[in-house]
């Protein structure tokens, strides 16, 4: 009788039970492959085992990083001249998912009463790709920061230039870098935080222009994708050759900072590099 009451379910029954579990209940870390309940991600949305920062919406990053934030240029979006139906459908979906009109959220934030110009790229907005409107928003942010003598903190998370916009997308690399150079010439601080993923034209331009370059643990940082590199050099690169940790070993990143420590670290850096502390 006991055997019948505690009989192991069949394979088919187990599959049915697993299928009944909602997808969002369990998560698997793409880095260490640990499996855990979604609630263990916590407020910062990080792996409880290895500290990998899962990709998050730009608006969520604002909430966990800044004391106050006022958005600017929120109505700038993809120009109407791009009429491809598939592209317009992707734009509509991205707007619905993120609540943003473009792949970057810009504004003025504060950390411990220190004002800072903020740019946050959203990986859920067509992979945070760099389009003409993205470049315009970031350029305006740097121009505003230069006029107001503000430091800039930029969180990059992007698949690179947005190919649907062709040369107009690629032009944004030079356009933004020019605005960064003017900001730097004014003696103002620019901090970059490389998030997963930071690749392509963003890596080749303003993501590596910072005075201080931070990164989140295990973030993918590179230019070309692994398959492109393998086909070009006819070799298999190391598994972690584009991880933030490897990139830091080669001198391109100053420090890797856990997401839970990011607010504190940025606050300290801004305080140390204000003109009063640096020159007063």
Curated annotation (Swiss-Prot):
Its EC number is 2.1.3.15. Keywords: ATP-binding, Cytoplasm, Fatty acid biosynthesis, Fatty acid metabolism, Lipid biosynthesis, Lipid metabolism, Metal-binding, Nucleotide-binding, Transferase, Zinc, Zinc-finger. One of its GO terms (cellular component) is acetyl-CoA carboxylase complex. It holds the Pfam family Carboxyl_trans. It comes from the Bacteria. It is an enzyme of class 2 (transferase). Belongs to the AccD/PCCB family. Acetyl-CoA carboxylase is a heterohexamer composed of biotin carboxyl carrier protein (AccB), biotin carboxylase (AccC) and two subunits each of ACCase subunit alpha (AccA) and ACCase subunit beta (AccD). This is Acetyl-coenzyme A carboxylase carboxyl transferase subunit beta. It comes from Lactobacillus helveticus (strain DPC 4571).
């Amino acid at each position: 009788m006991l055997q019948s009451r505690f009989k192991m379910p069949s394979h088919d029954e187990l599959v049915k039970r697993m299928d009944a579990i909602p997808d969002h209940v369990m998560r698997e870390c793409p880095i260490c492959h640990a499996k855990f309940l979604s609630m263990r991600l916590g407020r910062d949305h990080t792996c409880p085992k290895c500290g990998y920062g899962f990709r998050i919406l730009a608006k969520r990053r604002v909430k966990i990083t800044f004391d106050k934030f006022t958005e600017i240029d929120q109505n700038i979006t993809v120009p109407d001249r791009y009429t491809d139906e598939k592209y317009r459908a992707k734009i509509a979906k991205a707007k619905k998912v993120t609540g943003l009109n473009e792949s970057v959220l810009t504004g003025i934030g504060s950390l411990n009463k220190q004002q800072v110009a903020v740019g946050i790229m959203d990986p859920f907005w067509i992979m945070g790709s760099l389009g003409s409107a993205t470049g315009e928003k970031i350029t305006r942010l740097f121009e505003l920061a230069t006029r107001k003598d503000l430091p800039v903190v930029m969180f990059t998370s992007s698949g690179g230039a947005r190919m649907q916009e062709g040369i107009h997308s690629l032009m944004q690399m030079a356009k933004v870098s020019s605005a960064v150079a003017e900001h730097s010439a004014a003696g103002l601080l620019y901090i970059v935080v490389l998030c997963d993923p930071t690749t392509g034209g963003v890596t080749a331009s303003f993501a590596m222009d910072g005075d201080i370059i931070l990164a989140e643990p295990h973030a993918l940082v590179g230019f070309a994708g692994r398959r492109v590199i393998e086909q070009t050099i006819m070799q298999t690169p190391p598994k972690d050759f584009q991880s933030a940790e490897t990139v830091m070993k080669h001198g391109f990143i100053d420090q890797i900072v856990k997401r839970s420590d990011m607010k504190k670290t940025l606050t300290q850096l801004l305080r140390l590099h204000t003109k009063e502390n640096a020159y007063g």
